[in-house]
From Swiss-Prot:
It is found in: Cytoplasm. Belongs to the eukaryotic ribosomal protein eL32 family. InterPro entries: Ribosomal_eL32, Ribosomal_eL32_CS, Ribosomal_eL32_sf. GO terms for cellular component: cytosolic large ribosomal subunit. Keywords: Cytoplasm, Ribonucleoprotein, Ribosomal protein. PROSITE patterns: RIBOSOMAL_L32E (PS00580). Component of the large ribosomal subunit. It comes from the Eukaryota. One of its GO terms (biological process) is translation. SMART domains: Ribosomal_L32e. It comes from Ictalurus punctatus (Channel catfish). One of its GO terms (molecular function) is structural constituent of ribosome. This is Large ribosomal subunit protein eL32.
Amino acid sequence: MAALRPLTKPKIVKKRTKKFIRHQSDRYVKIRRNWRKPRGIDNRVRSGFKGQMLMPNIGYGSNKKTKHMLPSGFKKFLVHNVKELEVLLMSNKSYCAEIAHNVSSKNRKVIVERAAQLAIKVTNPNARLRSEENE
């Protein structure tokens, strides 16, 4: 079977690829880099002074058409069983399945086989599958 491709694959443009880092995280080791909104009354970052760190805001949002889109052009849909997989039957050109982390390896095999029959792309088909020589 040929590789499954999305119906359309628009160019995904990110307005910012750098991470937003927390104010003064470069100055103190105890302050982690993970973003926290500054809430102090005299804070320069919150006030938006020139030359300060940038704060995440609505303007950095993605295009509606490409939001949550994977580089392959599909959007992810989390699947726990075969019944949930069959929901994607009509929209297999725009959505791909991702098997949930808590699905057993026995059920994973069934889901992957059914996805191949329905021509649905699975992002993690080889996860938790043992090779034949180990058995």
